[in-house]
Amino acid sequence: MSVKVAINGFGRIGRNVLRAIIESGRTDIEVVAINDLGPVETNAHLFRFDSVHGRFPGEVKVAGDTIDVGRGPIKVTAVRNPAELPHKELGVDIALECTGIFTSRDKAAAHLAAGAKRVLVSAPADGADLTVVYGVNHEKLTNEHLVVSNASCTTNCLAPVAKVLNDAVGIEKGFMTTIHAYTGDQPTLDTMHKDLYRARAAAMSMIPTSTGAAKAVGLVLPELAGKLDGTSIRVPTPNVSVIDLKFVAKRATSKEEINEAIIAAASQQLKGILGFTDQPNVSIDFNHNPNSSTFHLDQTKVMEGTLVRVLSWYDNEWGFSNRMSDTAVAMGKLG
């Protein structure tokens, strides 16, 4: 039996979650509903043509209040209050909360009132029953976890790397910088924004701003709580980001040991989540890459044995959207 999911919010993440399900060919998850306040025809057009990921490789049909992307009609609604969505009627197992609005447990729980069995939020969520980075701590999911956060794209990139390196050599303390592609909450020209850095034109400057992604690793890996912090620099590219992590190891290590630990994990327990490259790649090379994190082996540096610097790439849209599907399926198996 496939897990039935409904997508609330058909923006960058909502559309990519559906596309990732279709393109991967997976049959263990079925999208039965989409809720978005935009016209059905507009949502279909934006799904069909994507400036970042290219044209959808299949046919997209609209008939009444449905969209068909190759697996039969998907019901489309335009309801403002998630508590009023037809989850019960449609037998929704997992509501994928992708609006970026209902990001606290209390707000996201409206989907439960509508009849969904569980909710997965596509962002950090205050008060969530559990914050999950698939491949790192998804096995902690239990029947008690009704509202779950899928963390952020940056935490999904950092956590697998941090887990492997903490297990291998120990992390005393560390600081991460994410060099991050601009996103939809940044303007094309200067305008009002509560964050004055993000008030500036996205494609014209490198923009320092904040991120809670490093601290959030402590929610996923309690052994690293309080040991990591970070910052963000938004750059004038539309997709693909990279983390630059510097940490103090608990014991002396080497570039070779660090890289070997990553290669071993990426080839075994974290295969499909953590990847690696030894090529002189640049950001565009990782566009549409489904990994949560792709470690750049030749960028590893070790100073005086214990000061370590590593670099890992991530498609901040596509990788995260693939993990939304993975986590939703894991939640669906809870019953």
Swiss-Prot record:
Pathway: Carbohydrate degradation; glycolysis; pyruvate from D-glyceraldehyde 3-phosphate: step 1/5. It catalyses: D-glyceraldehyde 3-phosphate + phosphate + NAD(+) = (2R)-3-phospho-glyceroyl phosphate + NADH + H(+). The keyword NAD applies. D-glyceraldehyde 3-phosphate binds at residues 152-154, 183, 198, 211-212, 234. The active site is at 153 (nucleophile). Keywords: Cytoplasm, Glycolysis, NAD, Nucleotide-binding, Oxidoreductase. It is found in: Cytoplasm. NAD(+) binds at residues 12-13, 36, 80, 122, 316. Catalyzes the oxidative phosphorylation of glyceraldehyde 3-phosphate (G3P) to 1,3-bisphosphoglycerate (BPG) using the cofactor NAD. The first reaction step involves the formation of a hemiacetal intermediate between G3P and a cysteine residue, and this hemiacetal intermediate is then oxidized to a thioester, with concomitant reduction of NAD to NADH. The reduced NADH is then exchanged with the second NAD, and the thioester is attacked by a nucleophilic inorganic phosphate to produce BPG. This is Glyceraldehyde-3-phosphate dehydrogenase. It comes from Xanthobacter flavus. The gene is gap.
